A protein has these predicted regions:
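C-terminal beta-signal and adjacent terminal beta-strands/loops
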Residues: 2-4, 564, 569, 603, ...
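Gram-negative outer-membrane beta-barrel transporters
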Residues: 32, 454-457, 461, 558, ...
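Extracytoplasmic beta-strand/coil segments of soluble accessory domains associated
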Residues: 70, 85, 95, 101-147
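Face-selective signature of the C-terminal outer-membrane beta-barrel domain
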Residues: 271, 319-352, 357-358, 366-479, ...
C-alpha cells in the first residue's frame, strides 16, 4: 500500500524532546464523570441554567470504589435538562477517542448522530456530521459557550481548532434550547464543547501515541496548580504535534496545536478566565473516488504520486492556520449573576487542487496541451464578538437577559492555474484566470430575555423571546459563478419565542417538554447571482420545534428517552460538484423521531451501554427522504472499569441513507465496532505517577463499505464516494510528573 512519505519527516528538536519525555513517562490519568451534571437537584435556579453551560460540570474526577452508571456512561441524559441531550464526559474522551480525534469523532457515539471521517479520526475534516438528519451548518457548535463557524454557510472546520486533548467535556443538545441559547442554527441543536479545567495540583504530563498509517502524536500537558502568591491562579497548557499518512493514499496530514487556559479568582465571587489556542495544519485532501476507482485501486484510493496527473498529491493540498481566544468574567453577588465573554477567532486557509482529480477532464493549459490544470484559492475569515448574560432572582424565579454580537469579515479568492508551472495563472491575460475575488461581512446580533418560574420545588417553566438579526454585505470584484462585480447588502431578522417545562417526580426521575421557533439567514451562495433580489433561495430557514422526554438516573442505571417533531421551511440542501459546494432551496421538510440511551451497571466492574434512534426526515411535497438523513441509528457496548483497568467494546450502527434528493444515490446501513483498553500502574516510579498504557482498535471487523456520497465530478457528473477506513490500531503511553 502506497503511503505519503513527506508527511512523516523527522521532527526537529521540539518534537524529539516530546518523544524522549513521553518514552520516559506520559499524560496524567484521571477518570471523568458527569455525575455533577446529571444528579437530580431540587435547586431550580441551578437546574434552569443555560444547557450549553452544563458541560462545565464534566471535570475529571478520580473514581474510587464501585463506579456509578453516571461515571461509566459513554453518553447520558441529564436530570436537569429541558431538552434531549447526550453528555459525553472526560472518561470517554480520554479512553475511547483517538489521540488524533476531535469533537466530531467523540459525538459519533450519540443517538441520531451520523459522522464520516474518511481518512481516519481527525486526519481530515469530517465530510459529514449530521444530527437527526440536520447537516453541518444547520446546528450550532460552541466552544466554552462561544458560537463559532464559517459565515459563508455556517459550517465548522472540525480539525482546525481544538484537539481532543484540549477538550474536557461535550454536550450534544438535540434541541433549540431556550431564548438564552445563543448561536447560529440552534434549531438543529447545539454541540457544546468545553475546554479542560486547570487542576489545583501542579503536574507535567507528557504523552506519546503511535499507530496505523504511521500515525504519531507527541504532546505535553502542564498544570500549574493553584498559585497562592497570585490569589489562587490556576493554568492548563497543552502543546501537541501529530503526523499521519492517513488511510487514503497520499492523504497525509501534519498538525500542531497549542492551547492555554488561565483562571484567576478575584475575591470570593468573581473569576477571570483567559483562553488562547493556535492550530496549524498541512494536509493533502482527496475529493472522493468513483466506483470504477474503488474497483480498480481499492477502497482507500485517494491521491497519487504521478506529477502528470491532476490527482497528484502535491497539487491537492491545504495550508490552514487558526486561532481562538477569549477573556471571560463571571461574578455572582446578592442574587445577581453576571457573565461576559469577549472573544476573537480566525481561520486562514490556502488551498490548491487539480482541475479534476478524478481524471475526467483532460490535461491542457494556455501554456501547453500536456500541462496539468488546477486551481489555487484562499478563504480567510476573522470574527470579533461578545456574549453578555445577566440574571437576577426575582419573585418565584429568575429573570435572565443578555445578548450575543458577532462581526465576521471574510476574504475569498480563487484562480485557474497551471500546476506544472508552479501554479502560474492559466489565462491570457492573467486576469482571465480569476474565478472569484470577494470580500464580505456578516453581522449577527441576538438579544434575549427569559423568565424561569419555579412553580414548585420540583417543577419550573422557562419562557422567553430572542431577537435574531443577520446582516450580510458583499463587495465582489469578481463574484463567484457570475464573474461580474457585485456590491450588495441584505438584512434578515425575526422574533423567536420559546417555552420549556421541567418536572422532577423523584430524586431519580424527571421529564420535560419544549416548544420553540428557529431561524437562520441564507448562506452567502445566495448572493452568487447578478441580481440577488430575484433569487428564490434568498429566504431564511425557519422551523417550529416540539419535543418531550424523560430521564432516569440512579447509581446503577442511567436511562433517557424522547420524541420530537420539527416543521422545517426553506430547507437549504447542498451538492458537491467538482469540489465546489452548490446550495439550493429544497422547500419544506418534516423531521420526526424517537431517541433513547442508557447505561446499566451489571456489577464486578462490568456495565452495558446502549442507545438508539428511529428518525424520519422527509420532503413535505414529495415525501422523499432528506439527503444524508439515516432512518435509524443504534449503539451497543460492554464496558469494564475496575481499579486501574479499563476496557470497552462498542458497536455503532448507522442505517440506510440517500446521498441526494429524489431518493437517489442510496447508501446502505453499516456498523463499526471499536475496542479500547488501558491500564494505569499502581506503583509510582520516582517522580512519575499514574503511568499508563492504552490501546485502541477501531473497526475491528474491517468493514470498508461505502458510507458517504462525497459529491460528483465536474466533467461527467460521476458520483464520488468515501468508504469506512480499514481496521486501525493505536497505542498510547503517558504519565504524570510530580
Amino acid at each position: 500500500m502506497t503511503r505519503l512519505i513527506s508527511t512523516t519527516d523527522v521532527r526537529k528538536s521540539t518534537c524529539l524532546a516530546f518523544c524522549i519525555a513521553a518514552i520516559l513517562s506520559g499524560p496524567a490519568f484521571a477518570d471523568g464523570t458527569a455525575a455533577a451534571a446529571v444528579a437530580a437537584s431540587s435547586d431550580s435556579t441551578a437546574a434552569s441554567a443555560p444547557q450549553t453551560q452544563n458541560a462545565q460540570n464534566l471535570g475529571a474526577v478520580q473514581v474510587t470504589g464501585t463506579a456509578t452508571a453516571s461515571e461509566i456512561a459513554p453518553t447520558q441524559g441529564s436530570t436537569i435538562a429541558i431538552q434531549p441531550q447526550s453528555i459525553i464526559g472526560d472518561l470517554y474522551l480520554r479512553e475511547n477517542v483517538a489521540a488524533t480525534g476531535d469533537y466530531t469523532d467523540a459525538i459519533s457515539i450519540s443517538p441520531s448522530v451520523y459522522s464520516v471521517a474518511p481518512n481516519g479520526p481527525g486526519l481530515m475534516e469530517a465530510s459529514e456530521v449530521a444530527i437527526r438528519g440536520f447537516q453541518d451548518g444547520q446546528y450550532n457548535v460552541t466552544f466554552d459557550g462561544i458560537p463559532w463557524g464559517d459565515s459563508n454557510d455556517f459550517t465548522h472546520h472540525s480539525t482546525s481548532y481544538f484537539t481532543n486533548q484540549d477538550t474536557g467535556g461535550i454536550i450534544v443538545d438535540r434541541g433549540p434550547g431556550t431564548a438564552s441559547t445563543l448561536g447560529n442554527a440552534t434549531f438543529g441543536g447545539t454541540v457544546a464543547v468545553d475546554s479542560r479545567t486547570p487542576s489545583d495540583t501542579f503536574s507535567v504530563s507528557p504523552y506519546l501515541s503511535f499507530g496505523s498509517w504511521d500515525t504519531q502524536v507527541q504532546g505535553i500537558e502542564l498544570n500549574t496548580g493553584a498559585i497562592p502568591q497570585t490569589g489562587g491562579t490556576t493554568a492548563f497548557v497543552n502543546v501537541q504535534n501529530s503526523s499521519s499518512d492517513g488511510y487514503l493514499t497520499y492523504a497525509g496530514q501534519r498538525r500542531q496545536n497549542v492551547f492555554a487556559k488561565v483562571v484567576q479568582p478575584i475575591g470570593d465571587n468573581t473569576t477571570l478566565t483567559f483562553v488562547g489556542m493556535y492550530n496549524n495544519i498541512n494536509q493533502y485532501v482527496p475529493l472522493g473516488e468513483t466506483r470504477a476507482q474503488i474497483n480498480q485501486y481499492g477502497p482507500n484510493y485517494g491521491l497519487s504520486n504521478n506529477p502528470d496527473s491532476q490527482n497528484y498529491y502535491r497539487y491537492n493540498r491545504d495550508e490552514i492556520n487558526t486561532y481562538f481566544g477569549y477573556v471571560a468574567l463571571h461574578s455572582a453577588f446578592d442574587g445577581w449573576t453576571i457573565d461576559n465573554k469577549l472573544y476573537t477567532l480566525s481561520y486562514n486557509h490556502f488551498g490548491w487542487n487539480g482541475e479534476d482529480p478524478n481524471g475526467e477532464t483532460p490535461n491542457g493549459t494556455v501554456y501547453s496541451p500536456t500541462d496539468v490544470p488546477g486551481q489555487d484559492m484562499r478563504n480567510s475569515y476573522t470574527s470579533w464578538g461578545d456574549i453578555f448574560r445577566i440574571s437576577k432572582e426575582v419573585g418565584p424565579g429568575e429573570i435572565r437577559t443578555g445578548f450575543w454580537y458577532d462581526y465576521q469579515t471574510n476574504l475569498r479568492w480563487q484562480n485557474e492555474v497551471d500546476d506544472t508551472l508552479n501554479f502560474a495563472p492559466n489565462g491570457v491575460p492573467a486576469s482571465a484566470a480569476v474565478d472569484r475575488y470577494m470580500t464580505d461581512t456578516l453581522k449577527t446580533f441576538q438579544p434575549f430575555v427569559e423568565y424561569n418560574w419555579n412553580i414548585t420545588d420540583t417543577a419550573w417553566l422557562t419562557g422567553g423571546v430572542k431577537y435574531a438579526d443577520f446582516e450580510r454585505d458583499i463587495n465582489a470584484i469578481v463574484n463567484q459563478k457570475t464573474g461580474e462585480p457585485l456590491d450588495y447588502s441584505k438584512d434578515w431578522n425575526k422574533l423567536l419565542p420559546s417555552l420549556a417545562a421541567h418536572w422532577q417526580f423523584t430524586s431519580d426521575w424527571t421529564a420535560y417538554a419544549q416548544w420553540a421557533k428557529g431561524f437562520l439567514a441564507p448562506n452567502l451562495n445566495t448572493f452568487y447571482t447578478v441580481n440577488p433580489l430575484s433569487s428564490s433561495d434568498l429566504k431564511p430557514e425557519q422551523t417550529v420545534n416540539r419535543q418531550i422526554g424523560t430521564t432516569w438516573n440512579d447509581d446503577r442505571l442511567t436511562l433517557s428517552a424522547d420524541v420530537y417533531s420539527i416543521d422545517f421551511n426553506n430547507l437549504i440542501s447542498s451538492r458537491n460538484i467538482g469540489g465546489v459546494t452548490n446550495f439550493f432551496n429544497e422547500g419544506g421538510a418534516i423531521y420526526r423521531g424517537f431517541e433513547t440511551e442508557g447505561t446499566y451497571v451489571l456489577g464486578s466492574g462490568f456495565s452495558v451501554y446502549g442507545n438508539g434512534s428511529l428518525n424520519r426526515s422527509t420532503d413535505k411535497t414529495t415525501n422523499d427522504w432528506v439527503p444524508d438523513a439515516p432512518h435509524k441509528t443504534a449503539a451497543l457496548g460492554l464496558i469494564y472499569r475496575e481499579g486501574p483497568f479499563y476496557a470497552s467494546l462498542i458497536d455503532k450502527f448507522v442505517g440506510h441513507t440517500f446521498g441526494d434528493t429524489g431518493n437517489s444515490q442510496p447508501i446502505g446501513g453499516y456498523a463499526i465496532t471499536n475496542f479500547a483498553t488501558s491500564y494505569t500502574f499502581v506503583h509510582d516510579m520516582g517522580e512519575m505517577k499514574n503511568i499508563k498504557i492504552g490501546m485502541q482498535v477501531n473497526n475491528i471487523f474491517d468493514n470498508k463499505s461505502i458510507d458517504f456520497l462525497a459529491g460528483y465530478t465536474a466533467e461527467d457528473n460521476t458520483p464520488l464516494y468515501f468508504t469506512i477506513p480499514e481496521r486501525s490500531y493505536e497505542l498510547t503511553l503517558s504519565a504524570k510528573f510530580f
